[in-house]
Regions:
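Alpha-helical segment proximal to the catalytic Tyr-Lys
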Residues: 1-189
């Protein structure tokens, strides 16, 4: 058993910033390797939208949340790459990183968590495609078949900690249809 700790930062925040965000403080506070209780711990940080790229990329990320799906996939990929049955998953997020964190947990609840073998066989794009299906009945049917063939049986998330969550992407009053697939409901698992 090991602990997988995923830390999703807010808009424009990155581990290399001069000022250290609270999410980065959480990431740095976790002892990687063998923890004090003898359990192996791994930490993965997902930088905030708008934290990298050219100025226009940073502005679009900050203003409209561009890059969020890339961050969700990066966090999900990290979990799939490192998860083994009985591992504990802890996910933290701040601001748009809270949205990212909830979406990652929603993706795990919706499509399941890929096994390492299925990840190696490039099924991550399939998982993302199914997660993006807007019709709930169609998504549920596709996800059930996908989970049975490519995912771990049951992957509970031990802890989801989010603070100052941003409730939406884009600009109020304009269409947000592209981002409506994100599952932000809290699962009983």
């Amino acid at each position: 058993m090991k602990r997988l700790v995923l830390c999703c930062d807010g808009t424009w925040n990155s581990p290399v910033n001069a000022s250290v965000s609270n999410i980065e403080k959480i990431a740095r506070s976790v002892r990687t390797g063998i923890g004090p209780d003898g359990v192996q711990q791994m930490v993965f940080s997902v930088e905030g939208v708008g934290a990298q790229g050219y100025l226009v990329d940073r502005l679009l990320g900050g203003a409209f949340g561009y890059g969020l799906t890339r961050n969700v996939v990066a966090g999900y990929r990290h979990l799939a790459l490192n998860y083994e049955p009985d591992d504990e998953i802890y996910v933290f997020g701040f601001s748009r990183g809270a949205y990212t964190a909830r979406s990652i947990v929603g993706m795990v609840a919706t499509v399941g968590l890929l096994t390492q073998d299925s990840l190696a066989r490039d099924h991550l794009c399939d998982a993302e495609r199914i997660y993006r299906v807007r019709d709930a009945a169609q998504r549920s049917e596709q996800a059930a078949a996908f989970r049975a063939e490519h995912c771990h049986d049951h992957v509970p998330v031990a802890f989801l900690g989010v603070f100052d969550p941003v409730g939406a992407l884009g600009v109020p009053g304009l269409s947000r249809r592209r981002s409506r697939f994100h599952d932000l409901r809290l699962s009983t698992d």
